[in-house]
Each structure stands twice: as structure tokens, then as C-alpha cells.
């Protein structure tokens, strides 16, 4: 079952998701499409990663690097269509080549920040420096793309001739356009072998965005990292309904946290009408 199938359950999950401060729309879409983990190992692994982010976020000394990371994550865009074109050996247009270059440069920048925060071991980001080299032959490190003169001496010469012409020269233009098309085809073929790495990098950056947002939400709501019990007893201490708690606080009222423990047998919750039984459930 995917998360998007559960968000309408009346347990405050949608409220928490709506208040999750992610920096990319792609990250939120990926979260909603996430398959809910069912095995203990996957759940513990997710919490282990989140705990590392939490420990980094709560340290004031890391704030400058975290601000830089958040700023970079705002530039994360989904380019799955372009990646699929690479997988299918299509020739990319200039916009798609720009998207690939932008993602590769963004991945490298974020990888450097993750190293400084000592989080690089938590989430693997593929090395895309070769992709940048292919799309940045002059080493300018600028997140723009066009068919650079460096790709072809002949193209450079044709462009030079067109610049000095007073009138539009259709023959020169067509010849230059033909060379540009050949270069696009060559670049697309070179980049096609990096399609899987680009896809993995895109997902890794979104995963970083999500864990960063979850870490801040953990601090904001004073949440805990649960232990998974293996003795058949489920126990919660200080449990609260986030949406109800938030609504009460806006009226200067307090939510009374609930402690509850139950076994793998039928459990009956009793209490007065309007006493909070449904909220607990």
C-alpha cells in the first residue's frame, strides 16, 4: 500500500504531510507514492537515517550548511521524462540537455554539502561529474546549456562567418544547424549510459529533502524515535493527535497527552462521552 492511499485516514497523517516543509514538489510526490514499509529492517533503517539528520539539524553550528542545502533543494525538478528519453536512446533537445546538466551540477553541489555535514554515508548520491564534463566542455560551471563552439571547430567557424554577414545566409545557417543536430545526437548517446545514475541521483536528492523536512518536524512537535517491540506489547507514551493539538493551541488550550499499552488481544477503551476516545483511536 502506498502512502497516498492512507492520507485520508482520520489520524492526523494528512495534517502532518501538509505541514512537512519540503523544498521540492517532486519530493512530495515521491513521498506520496512511497510504498509503506512492512518489515522491521526497513522501518529501522528509515529511522536510523532520520536520526542522523535530526542530530545534524539540532546543532546550531550546522545551520549555515543546512541553509545552503535547503536553498539547493529548492532547485530540484523532476526530469523523469528526459531520463526515459535517454534510456530509450532518443536524441535530446537543448532544454532536455539543460535539464540533465542542471541535475548533475545540483547533485554534485548537494553531495559536497552532505560531506561537510557528515551525512554522505546515509544517502548515496551517484557521481555525475562525467555528465557535467560532457555538457560543460569549457568548464564554466554555469547551469545553462547551448551547443558550444568547443564541440566543433567547423561549427565555430560557421558561426563566425554568420556574425560578420550583413544579411541572413540561409546556406550557412542550414549547415550550422546540421552540425548542431549531429552534436545533440552524439551528446545524447554519450549521456544514455548515465540514465540510471541520473534517475538514482534525482531520487536521492528528494530523499534528502524529505529527511531534512522530517527532522525539522520531529523537533517542532517534540516527536520521538520509537523502539519496535517484539514482546507482543504495543505501548505509547505522551501520544497526541497533531491536528487536534494544533487547533487547541490556537485557542490557548492544551492537549492532554495519552499513555496507552495493549497486547495482541482485543482491547476495550472506556470513558465518558466527548472524553477523547475517538481521538486516541
Placement of each model-derived feature along the sequence:
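Basic/polar, acidic-poor N-terminal "presequence/leader" segments
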Residues: 1-17, 192, 199, 203-206, ...
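Conserved amphipathic alpha-helical "coupling/scaffold" segments
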Residues: 1-146
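Charged/polar positions within long, soluble alpha-helices
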Residues: 55, 59, 81-88, 109-119, ...
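Glycine- and acidic
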Residues: 62, 187-192, 267-271
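Short coil/turn segments at secondary-structure boundaries
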Residues: 67-71, 185, 220-221
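Extended, charged alpha-helical coiled-coil/arm scaffolds that mediate oligomerization and mechanical coupling
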Residues: 130-203, 207
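Conserved NTPase motor "head" modules and their coupling/switch loops across ABC/AAA+ ATPases, GTPases
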Residues: 200-275
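Walker A/P-loop
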Residues: 278-279
Amino acid at each position: 500500500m502506498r502512502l497516498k492511499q492512507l492520507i485520508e485516514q482520520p489520524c492526523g497523517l494528512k495534517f502532518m504531510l501538509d505541514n512537512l516543509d519540503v523544498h521540492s514538489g517532486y519530493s512530495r510526490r515521491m513521498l506520496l507514492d512511497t510504498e509503506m514499509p512492512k518489515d522491521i529492517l526497513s522501518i529501522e533503517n528509515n529511522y536510523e537515517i532520520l536520526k542522523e539528520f535530526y542530530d545534524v539539524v539540532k546543532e546550531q553550528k550546522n545551520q549555515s550548511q543546512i541553509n545552503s542545502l535547503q536553498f539547493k533543494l529548492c532547485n530540484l525538478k523532476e526530469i523523469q521524462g528526459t531520463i526515459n528519453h535517454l534510456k530509450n536512446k532518443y536524441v535530446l533537445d537543448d532544454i532536455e540537455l539543460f535539464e540533465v546538466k542542471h541535475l548533475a551540477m545540483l547533485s554534485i553541489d548537494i553531495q559536497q554539502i552532505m560531506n561537510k555535514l557528515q551525512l554522505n554515508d546515509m544517502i548515496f548520491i551517484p557521481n555525475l561529474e562525467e555528465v557535467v564534463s560532457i555538457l560543460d566542455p569549457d568548464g564554466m560551471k554555469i547551469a545553462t546549456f547551448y551547443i558550444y563552439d568547443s564541440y566543433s571547430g567547423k561549427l565555430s567557424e560557421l558561426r563566425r562567418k554568420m556574425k560578420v554577414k550583413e544579411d541572413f545566409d540561409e546556406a550557412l545557417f542550414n549547415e550550422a544547424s546540421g552540425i548542431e543536430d549531429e552534436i545533440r545526437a552524439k551528446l545524447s548517446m554519450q549521456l544514455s549510459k548515465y540514465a540510471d545514475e541520473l534517475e538514482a541521483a534525482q531520487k536521492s536528492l528528494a530523499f534528502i529533502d524529505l529527511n531534512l523536512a522530517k527532522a525539522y518536524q520531529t523537533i517542532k512537535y517534540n516527536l520521538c524515535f520509537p523502539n519496535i517491540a517484539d514482546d507482543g506489547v504495543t505501548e505509547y507514551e505522551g501520544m497526541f493527535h497533531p491536528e487536534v493539538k494544533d487547533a487547541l493551541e490556537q485557542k490557548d488550550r492544551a492537549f492532554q497527552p495519552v499513555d496507552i499499552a495493549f497486547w495482541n488481544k482485543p482491547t476495550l477503551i472506556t470513558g465518558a462521552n466527548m472524553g477523547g476516545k475517538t481521538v486516541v483511536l
